[in-house]
Amino acid sequence: MAIAAATVVEAIAIRRKQLFILLMVGAVCLGTSQSVQAQCTAKNEAFQSGEHVMYDLYFNWKFIWKKVGLASLTTNATTYHSEPAFRFNLLCVGSKKTDFFFKMRDTLTCITTQQLEPLYFRKGAEEGKRYTVDEVNFSYRNGKCIVDQQRTLYGKTDKKHDEMPVCVYDMLSILLQARSYDPSDYKPGVKILFSM
């Protein structure tokens, strides 16, 4: 599991829209390391079922910002294994101009409890000339986060099983957690680490 971090000051200075963009293109990852205690929940104060948000995607290199595509995020109430849950779908599409350099068509699906605890994640990614499918199932037992993941690339599937004493998130559920935080008490230079 990779540990991703970003300075909270950057998240405060960048509007939520820009934070989302940076998270999606891998420029910024936020997080916190915490005890699982059989759950990794947060209070949802940032979104509700039926929400649909469009984002512009930008490439950032030093002082250069270039629009490279669009992203669409939808939020819906659902059930997962007969329990109430949220389903988040994110579709990222590069523009025709950027397709010349690097084609990007990503579809991400995340299912969480109503308290934003990750349950399932899938990413189908056409990036450049390759297509990958990543799937992750999360469960919680004996104070541990159990993560069963698999990646399919070029017809070959690799599977991995981890049991972690900390909360583990996927790239979409961590965004949802970050959107629910109140950064007003954070100080410059403070870092919050998340296991992903």
Q: Which residues are covered by each model-predicted region?
A:
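Hydrophobic alpha-helical segments and helix pairs
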Residues: 102-153
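Bacterial N-terminal signal peptides
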Residues: 21-31
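N-terminal cleavable signal peptides for secretion/export
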Residues: 36-107, 124-131
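A structural detector for beta-sheet-dominated domains
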Residues: 56-58, 76-78, 91-93, 113, ...
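Solvent-exposed helix/loop surface patches that form functional interfaces
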Residues: 48-50, 131-196
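Bacterial N-terminal signal peptides that target proteins for export
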Residues: 1, 8-22
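Glycine-centered signal
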Residues: 6, 13-14, 30, 35
